[in-house]
Amino acid sequence: THLNYYVRTKLMWNSSLDVDAIVHDYCQKFYGEAADWIEKYIWDLEDAVENTDLHVQWGNKHHIPWEIIFTDSLIDTLQEHLDHAQQRISEPTNQLHVDVLQEYHHYLIAFLSAQQLTSLGKYDQAVNKIDEALVAKSNLSRVRSNLLPYAPSWVVETSDSTLEGLSDICQYLLDRINGTIGNLVAFLPCSWKFKTDPFEDGLIEQWYRLDQDIGWDSVTTTLYWENQGYQNKAGYGYIGYAWYQTKFEVKNDVENCPVSLTFGGVCGQEIWVWINQLLVFHGENESSSKPFDISLPENIQAGTNQITVRIHGHGFYRGAQGGIYRRAFLWIPNN
């Protein structure tokens, strides 16, 4: 953020200045003998954002597909730049500046890892990454309390874009499968069949029926659909109706039990769910950031079952956010 302010302030006084030169000047003044490596860090990250073929909009984490941008290769490269910077430092103030950037880096990578692990249904591992992020956050707070953006309580309570909010979501999901309030039956597959429905043909043609061959695509349910190519040439995500479908297996000992279905995260304003052709849920999505539960009817059967989901995402939400982006699972409540 301080680099952004530095560049913006310089450009406010003289908009013809060269941005590369401003960044170089900033690094020389702020990082001293480590400046060259920090400059490499900045431009490698900037290039990764610039070169993504997905829609990117600064100001909201939902509009930046960080999990696509931060590849393992990029993470390793950025850490190598920081390691080289640490080796070049001798002046205490510059050392502090590099240390702070390293903690920012630790915090960001741990936070992103926790988000990805939560989307994949690996909640125990996500909790560990959240703990790592908390350590980095604590280290930053000891340097200065305002180094990380302040998040008011309403943001924490309604969003997964803060560490505290993500921790609450992860614990909510974990409690449903680890015996706290329920036990896991099965995770639904990561990969589902998928089809956009811009002309609302799906209900008329009954796409929820068993074995409907309508030319489905295949997507993962751990990323927004925009992050998987469903966007226009300008980079804005698909807006309208879309359908998901998959099959799942249920063991004999679960048949006739009070099974619940939890969606870890769905971005869309209205949702329909069919199990074995029966509509079991239709309603407004109260929060695109938070999980929600559905009590399933008795038509869950031992063996193979089919689930179909219809989602309506309308024009209020723009950018890289649409569809199922955290894994769904079946569980049995303790009571």
Where in this protein do the model-derived segments appear?
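Accessory beta-strand-rich segments of carbohydrate-active enzymes
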Residues: 239, 244-335
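Short intrinsically disordered coil segments
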Residues: 23, 27, 207-210, 262-264, ...
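Catalytic domains of carbohydrate-active enzymes that cleave complex glycans
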Residues: 7-189
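Extracellular ligand-binding/catalytic regions of CAZymes and related secreted enzymes
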Residues: 4
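Short acidic/histidine-rich active-site segments
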Residues: 1
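Accessory carbohydrate-binding/adhesion or oligomerization-edge regions at the termini
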Residues: 164-232, 246-249, 304-335
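Outer-membrane beta-barrel proteins
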Residues: 234-236
